[in-house]
Amino acid sequence: MTKKIILPSPAKLNLFLYITNKRADGYHELQTLFQFLDFGDDISLEVNESGEIELLNAIEGVAKEQNLIYRAAKLLQNHTACSKGAKIGVTKRLPMGGGVGGGSSNAATVLVGLNHFWQTGLSLEQLAELGLSLGADVPIFVRGFAAFAEGVGEKLVACQPRESWYVVLKPNVSISTAAVFQDPNLPRNTPKRTLSRLLSEEWTNDCEKVVRDHYFEVEDLIAELLQYATFRLTGTGACIFAEFESEAEAKAVFAHKPHNIFGFIAKGQNRSPLHQMLNLTTFPQ
């Protein structure tokens, strides 16, 4: 492979998020549902025999050793003792700190893509285990299927929620995930429910009230758009989203977003666009 290959690095949403317990070690147990979107960044890969990892558009002021894309490539290269190299570029569309998985998705696309084109032969499960050291959400993107997560996020069950249309908006604020989980008003005893029951119920997010109480930018945007649609938080934010049955309905609401707010329209995907493109088998069939 000498030509440049462009691979999708999709966004994700947490369609619901419930916190069921705080453990003695400080970690929170949760129940959440991840779904991919047909919108995201693009990762370009150009494999070569140099043995070097070159970032084509490194982030200014960030050492390459701290860049998740570089770290993912080096991790796979070292783990498999691969002698090949690659030039890697990224076209960013996803907002930083939006809670839609940009960095984790980029790392996963690099792991999956280079494993494929370097022919290093790791299974998706092996790649997911490797990717966990890069971030808690990386295995979701590596496995490539919409998933119900429990525990501290490590117990995954593939599932197929409805593939709706979404309007996703990014309030002009950065939110500290750590601060949200340390907040004394955060619910920590939501009863555990079975996946089948959760899929039949209306979905909410236990973090949303805390975030809306502390970040007026999120509260004001949700309130402003309430006359058009009910938006809710994904993860700990900052992005919010609303669900629609059709693209036309989504476009009609999107037209009312404030001009200074970044946003996009996307369709839910239970199989990652990356895995669709590479025709990879996802877990479990």
UniProtKB/Swiss-Prot annotation:
Biological process annotations from GO: isopentenyl diphosphate biosynthetic process, methylerythritol 4-phosphate pathway; terpenoid biosynthetic process
Class of this enzyme: transferase
Parts forming coiled coils: none
Pathway: Isoprenoid biosynthesis; isopentenyl diphosphate biosynthesis via DXP pathway; isopentenyl diphosphate from 1-deoxy-D-xylulose 5-phosphate: step 3/6
Active site: 12, 137
Function: Catalyzes the phosphorylation of the position 2 hydroxy group of 4-diphosphocytidyl-2C-methyl-D-erythritol.
Name this protein carries in UniProt: 4-diphosphocytidyl-2-C-methyl-D-erythritol kinase
